[in-house]
């Protein structure tokens, strides 16, 4: 009976961990889509290839781009 309880506890912890990892992946995907949308709109209105990313860099929004190298990578996406 103790082994069953331990196995159920381990399974619950693993399922919780998987749910957290999946949520973080969805969050970063949404941030990337926001970035790509902003970049596209900026390019259409200003005739440039890349939107400035200072507003996207910060721990509050899990940005896809916080360095110019990464910015260049996403802008050439």
Curated annotation (Swiss-Prot):
Molecular function as annotated in GO: ion channel inhibitor activity; toxin activity
Share the domain note from the entry.
The presence of a 'disulfide through disulfide knot' structurally defines this protein as a knottin. The cysteine framework is VI/VII (C-C-CC-C-C).
Q: Which GO terms describe its cellular component?
A: extracellular region
Species name: Conus ventricosus
**Similarity comment:** Belongs to the conotoxin O2 superfamily.
Write down the superkingdom of origin. Answer: Eukaryota
Per the UniProt record, the lineage of the source organism begins with: Eukaryota, Metazoa, Spiralia, Lophotrochozoa, Mollusca
Q: Which InterPro entries match?
A: Conotoxin (IPR004214)
Q: What is this protein called?
A: Conotoxin VnMEKL-0111
Q: Signal peptide location in the record?
A: 1-19
Which keywords accompany this UniProt record? Disulfide bond, Knottin, Neurotoxin, Secreted, Signal, Toxin
Report the SS bond pairs. Answer: 50-66, 57-71, 65-75
Where is it predominantly found? secreted
Expressed, tissue-wise, as follows: Expressed by the venom duct.
Kindly give the Pfam families that the UniProt entry links to this protein. Answer: Conotoxin (PF02950)
């Amino acid at each position: 009976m103790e082994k069953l309880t331990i196995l159920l506890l381990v399974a619950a912890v693993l399922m919780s961990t998987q749910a957290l990892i999946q949520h973080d992946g969805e969050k970063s995907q949404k941030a990337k889509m926001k970035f790509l949308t902003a970049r596209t709109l900026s390019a259409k209105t200003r005739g440039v290839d890349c939107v400035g990313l200072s507003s996207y860099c910060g721990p509050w929004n899990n940005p896809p781009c916080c360095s110019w190298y990464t910015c260049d990578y996403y802008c050439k996406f």
